[in-house]
């Protein structure tokens, strides 16, 4: 494997040296019953070793196979108040696809959330362009009302859009209102599934067959898994 990795021009050079059997710490192997338990065991081990050996948190590293797996460790670390830094990527909740899904949740909980509104109104693309969004922002500022209020009452506030754009705006409004209505009878996991499917987020991600697209898909699936754990 190392002979192939060496062909990578961007690879960081390293020398792999085998150790003698009588040197180094033995490897502990454990089997966890769930990813949540795995995260807790790893973090508890860090706390134990830090206490025994008078170490600092920056003396420890957690290696995982895929980016999506970082969530469970990040949550376990946060629960115990342990600071951490992600190397070679972003923290799970800072990844674009995760922030996109969470923005839909934020808008469902609070339709007047302007940051969430701007992030979701045309993502995935639904034909509501920057010009229209800028008009909504201007009308909102001039009338002292939220962006959502303008979207729901475009003619009352004199928003100048054509019939096609109006129909697309109303389609978005109806989508969000349906999620809001579902909030009464469905839990976060069920609403999360609805959001990624009906908004078109998962469909867009699945159309990207690159390694990055696969990673984004795995991240979204891991987010939904976390919601399921929360609701269980």
Regions found by a protein language model. Name each.
Residues 1-83, 106-110, 166:
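Helicase P-loop NTPase motor core
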Residues 62, 88-89, 152, 208:
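Proline- and acidic/polar-enriched loop/turn elements at helix boundaries
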């Amino acid at each position: 494997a190392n002979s192939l990795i060496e062909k990578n021009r961007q690879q960081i050079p390293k020398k792999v040296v085998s150790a003698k059997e009588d040197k180094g710490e033995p490897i502990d192997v454990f089997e966890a019953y769930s990813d949540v338990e795995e995260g807790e065991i790893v973090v508890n081990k860090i706390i134990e070793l830090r206490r025994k050996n008078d170490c600092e948190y920056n003396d420890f590293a957690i290696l995982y196979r895929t980016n999506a797996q970082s969530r469970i460790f990040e949550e376990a670390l946060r629960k115990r108040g342990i600071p951490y830094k992600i190397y070679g990527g972003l923290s799970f909740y800072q990844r674009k696809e995760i922030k996109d899904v969470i923005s839909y949740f934020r808008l469902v909980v609070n339709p007047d959330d302007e940051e969430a509104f701007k992030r979701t109104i045309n993502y995935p693309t639904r034909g509501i362009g920057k010009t229209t969004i800028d008009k909504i922002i201007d009308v909102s500022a001039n009338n002292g009302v939220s962006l959502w209020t303008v979207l729901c009452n475009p003619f009352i506030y004199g928003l100048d859009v054509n019939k096609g754009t109006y129909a697309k705006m109303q389609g978005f409004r109806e989508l969000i209102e349906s999620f809001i209505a579902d909030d009464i009878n469905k839990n976060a996991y069920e609403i999360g599934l609805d959001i990624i499917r009906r908004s078109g987020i998962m469909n867009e991600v699945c159309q990207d067959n690159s390694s990055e697209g696969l990673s984004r898909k795995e991240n979204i699936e891991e987010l939904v898994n976390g919601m399921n754990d929360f609701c269980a």
